[in-house]
A protein has these predicted regions:
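An N-terminal hydrophobic leader/cap segment in hydrolases
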Residues: 24-81
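Conserved alpha/beta-hydrolase
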Residues: 111, 118-140
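Alpha/beta-hydrolase active-site loop
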Residues: 143-164
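Gly/Ala-rich beta-loop-alpha elbow adjacent to hydrolase catalytic centers
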Residues: 167-176
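Hydrolase active-site cap/lid region
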Residues: 183-233
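Short beta-strand/loop motif that positions the catalytic acidic residue
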Residues: 246-247, 252-255, 259
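Conserved alpha/beta-hydrolase "acid-adjacent" motif
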Residues: 260-266
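Catalytic histidine-centered segment of alpha/beta-hydrolase-like enzymes
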Residues: 285-295
Length: 307
């Protein structure tokens, strides 16, 4: 039986999750010191300070680790994938001859953070592949950004001779779309899932500017760095504008109404811009815990397996 999804739907989940979203621990004095430095030196040496700011912006503050292992982690076929000058840690479950579902994790996370999707998908005949992005988990490198993550994703898709579906969380969503639009626009994904999709790159950068109280000269130089790395205008790095430029069969967006890391605005705009998109809205599961909600998991598996 074919499932029918509304264009925008609320998920009435009864799952009770008392855990708090993990948030970085930045001391107030550390932030004040950084703000003073960027405000003062950013006016005198805008280009140099913009480079320092970009280094901070593109460097994960920690590498996610597991405090203990479990059956899913232990059952993975783990290997090192050579990407550019780095070794990328890849986790594979199931038969790679079956339809591939790629898991693209978020910023400062790791591939196995999305392992709750492995068992149900493998049991239904899919092969699930996850990876630690450059500078994350057990992969090499110290810095990352959307184009680097997108090139990693593209290389993995080519390695598997294409994939059927993908589940992205936050930063992983941006990498998936960038891969399809700018790295190799011949690639296609039939079933694409976005969990807590981030907003426009420009808006993310503006939030960073606000946090460090960046002066105008530093902002201008920072944008120049980003545009040079991407070889395009900052305004063109925008998932909401990508619909006509990517080959995606169906898109399922899942976002919490009270996500205070990446607000729901982007998901609401995308679902109206993309004809083949549906939006499932949750309440009370935040930015990180939404991925582990069992009701969300069921809907994602149903979406991927529905023909």
């Amino acid at each position: 039986m074919k499932l029918v999804f509304e264009k925008i739907e609320s998920l009435n989940s009864t799952h009770i999750d008392k855990n708090q979203d993990r948030l970085p621990k930045v001391q107030k004095w550390q932030m004040q010191l950084a703000q003073t430095g960027f405000q003062t030196l950013g006016r005198i040496f805008p280009e140099w300070m913009a480079k320092q700011a970009y280094d901070i912006f593109s460097t994960p503050r920690w590498r996610a680790k597991h405090s203990r292992t479990d059956e899913i982690i232990e059952s993975a076929n783990v290997y090192d994938f050579v990407f550019e000058e780095h070794f990328v840690k890849v986790y594979e479950w199931g038969n790679p001859q079956d339809k591939i579902i790629l898991l693209a994790h978020g910023w400062e996370s790791r591939g196995t953070a999305l392992r709750m999707y492995v068992a149900p998908l493998v049991s239904l005949g899919y092969c699930v592949v996850a990876y630690d992005a450059v500078g994350h988990g057990d992969s090499g490198g110290k810095q990352n950004n959307v184009p680097t993550n997108a090139r990693t994703i593209t290389a993995l898709i080519h390695h598997y001779n294409g994939i059927y579906g993908a589940i992205g969380h936050s930063f992983g969503c941006s990498g998936l779309v960038y891969a399809l639009q700018y790295v190799d626009n011949t690639l296609s994904i039939e079933k694409l899932v976005f969990l807590a999709v981030p907003y426009k790159t420009k808006k993310i950068i503006e939030s960073f500017f606000t946090a460090i109280k960046a002066p105008d000269g530093l902002k201008k130089s920072f944008y120049s760095i980003v545009e040079k790395l991407n070889n395009r205008s900052i305004d063109d790095i925008d998932i909401t504008k990508s619909y006509l430029h990517v080959k995606v069969g169906q898109l399922l967006l899942i976002h919490d109404r009270f996500d205070d890391v990446t607000g729901i605005d982007a998901a609401e705009e995308i679902v109206h811009q993309w004809d083949n998109a549906k939006l499932l809205v949750t309440e009370g599961y935040g930015h990180f815990r939404i991925a582990k909600n069992p009701d969300v998991l069921k809907r994602i598996v149903a979406f991927i397996t529905d023909n």
